[in-house]
Amino acid sequence: MKTILITGFDPFGGEPINPAWEAVKTMDGYTDGDYKVVTQMVPTIRYKSVDTVKAAAEQCQPDFILCVGQAGGRPDITVERVAINCDDFRIPDNGGNQPEDEPVVDDGPSAYFATLPIKNIVNALHQNGIPAKVSNTAGTFVCNHLMYGVCHYAAQKGNIKAGFMHIPYLPSQVVDKPNQPSMAVETVRATSVSYTHLRAHETLS
């Protein structure tokens, strides 16, 4: 049986919840065909985020890693194409770190592209009635940091494919944020189910 490690961040930026972890946490132990899901909550802290995912990966030995993060203000599920080797945090992370124009990995490549089939994932979500699109920027906060760090780790391992998905706010988060888009947690959770099903029942690179 092959393993998909799916991660979600803890709350940050003054929010009481993070839709990424709310959606991901119930997927732990989920199976479809020859694939099983392992989940991991990730701290929204610069280096600790990557270290947490690496530790989980060393334990469960995944074939694929899908990291999930919140992107408040985006109306769709956005599957990230690329992570850049730059930490430029607009606000402090949960550890109080706020680097400016610093590398994620010293002497690392300028960028890493996701090695998951991003357009196939978007198409699978569309087929399940979920609004989604490819995104060409993961920002420069901890989401980009994690995507870059995990892709760097996967490249070093050589046998893991990795990527990142941003999700909108949950409805409860926008009660006091007029005109901000949101998406029900059940819909967000369905994205992980859709990806696992796609992986289990389609031929993907």
Task: List PLM regions with ranges.
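N-terminal catalytic or cofactor-binding beta/alpha core of small enzyme domains
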Residues: 1-138, 152-156, 180-191
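Short, solvent-exposed polar/charged micro-motifs at secondary-structure junctions
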Residues: 48-51, 144-145, 174
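Small/polar glycine-rich anion-binding or flexible loop at a beta-alpha turn
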Residues: 139-143, 168-169
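Short secondary-structure boundary/hinge segments and terminal tails
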Residues: 22, 143-146
